[in-house]
């Protein structure tokens, strides 16, 4: 056997057994990712009442906060107001329960509101909803306490190996490229499907798998990224501290101040001020921890307001000081932060246009096709090998009888 033939056998064995062994894990992870590409549209299809808006006009954000607070009752607090990117979609107020040290993640409740009237359309516990379940399953198999995120990351490693070895195995042994694109390379439809679909989706699948690995091991990925590009020091996640109870500004005044500082923009989201995360948020706005030393009096709650530029819909983030009303635009992300952001966007299919979004959707659907056709190919080959072995045994027995 030649060296190339031996190498092909190694890749084939690796490809076959990783595919068969991990199919039960890879397929649901991939399909859940495909569904999440258009999660809002899927949710609207299943729950049309949540999206039954009466128009595209807006009322002051304080009306949405007040309406949501009445609907959710005690135990959770409004934390953010998200405005739709286009007409026909609801305003969503995100409310959070209290965070318990060492306990489960805080409860998250989304309140869907009619933009022109602030009328409550629906109140949804995010983690118990279908979309919330898909998010949790795709991220950590709903078992974060059992290293679910790392398991998903290693599944991504398996998918990356499958996509790369698949390219090698697809390549015609003659070395000619174009003959490999023919439908009739094999006698069976399942084999032709596996080969042809596998070739066209292999590179996008490798890209989505690689970005999924990055997201599956966040701390390791951050360590690697920060070693090659500058990143903002880690701090508390913006907007996830305790909501300030004594805020001087209102959602209306904070939004007005932010809009006045950035002409030509419109509201995307308002995050209510937090009592414990303000320092890290100020540092993030000013580009580092040194800002704290330069302005030690810069303390107290801050409002984080996201605005959309027209016509690109690019997001601009500004901080509004709750005490003084001063507005400060958040600096552009550092190179490492921007690269990490793009890793997530590429994986999600967001911020990249409808073509890539559709391609990402296909990378979630195709593993199901590969699993079905691959198992059929393996089973067919297994039966063929048994048949050949049986015929050899019969032939050997006949020769012995003749002797």
Model-derived regions, located:
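Conserved histidines in hydrophobic membrane contexts and catalytic metal-binding motifs
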Residues: 1-403
């Amino acid at each position: 056997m030649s060296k190339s033939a031996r190498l092909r056998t190694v890749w084939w064995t690796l490809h076959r057994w990783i595919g068969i062994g991990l199919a039960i894990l890879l397929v649901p992870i991939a399909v859940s990712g495909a569904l999440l590409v258009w999660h809002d549209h899927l949710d609207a299809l299943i729950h049309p009442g949540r999206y039954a808006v009466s128009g595209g006009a807006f009322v002051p954000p304080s009306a949405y906060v007040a309406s949501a607070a009445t609907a959710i009752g005690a135990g959770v607090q409004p934390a953010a107001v998200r405005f739709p990117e286009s007409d026909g979609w609801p305003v969503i107020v995100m409310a959070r329960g209290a965070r318990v040290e060492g306990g489960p993640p805080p409860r998250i409740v989304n309140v869907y509101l009619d933009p022109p009237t602030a009328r409550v359309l629906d109140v949804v516990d995010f983690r118990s909803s279908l979309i919330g379940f898909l998010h949790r399953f795709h991220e950590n198999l709903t078992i974060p306490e059992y290293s679910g995120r790392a398991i998903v990351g290693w599944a991504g490693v398996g998918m990356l190996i499958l996509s790369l070895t698949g390219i090698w195995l697809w390549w015609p042994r003659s070395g000619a490229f174009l003959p490999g694109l023919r439908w009739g390379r094999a006698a069976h439809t399942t084999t032709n499907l596996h080969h042809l679909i596998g070739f066209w989706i292999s590179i996008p699948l490798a890209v989505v798998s690689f970005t999924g690995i990055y997201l599956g091991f966040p701390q390791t990925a951050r360590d690697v990224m920060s070693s090659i590009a500058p990143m903002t020091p880690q701090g508390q996640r913006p907007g996830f501290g305790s909501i300030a109870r004594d805020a001087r500004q209102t959602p209306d005044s904070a939004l007005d101040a932010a809009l006045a500082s950035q002409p030509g923009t419109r509201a995307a989201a308002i995050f209510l001020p937090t009592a414990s995360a303000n320092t890290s948020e100020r540092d993030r706005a000013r580009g580092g921890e040194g800002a704290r030393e330069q302005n030690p009096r810069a303390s107290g709650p801050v409002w984080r307001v996201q605005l959309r530029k027209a016509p690109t819909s690019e997001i601009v983030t500004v901080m509004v000081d709750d005490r003084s009303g001063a507005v400060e635009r958040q600096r552009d992300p550092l190179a490492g932060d921007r690269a990490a952001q793009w890793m997530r966007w590429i994986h999600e299919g967001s911020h990249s246009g409808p073509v890539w979004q559709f391609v990402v959707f296909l990378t979630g659907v195709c593993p199901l096709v590969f699993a079905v056709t691959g198992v059929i190919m393996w089973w067919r080959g297994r039966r063929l090998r048994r048949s050949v072995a049986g015929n050899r045994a019969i032939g050997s027995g006949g020769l012995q009888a003749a002797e």
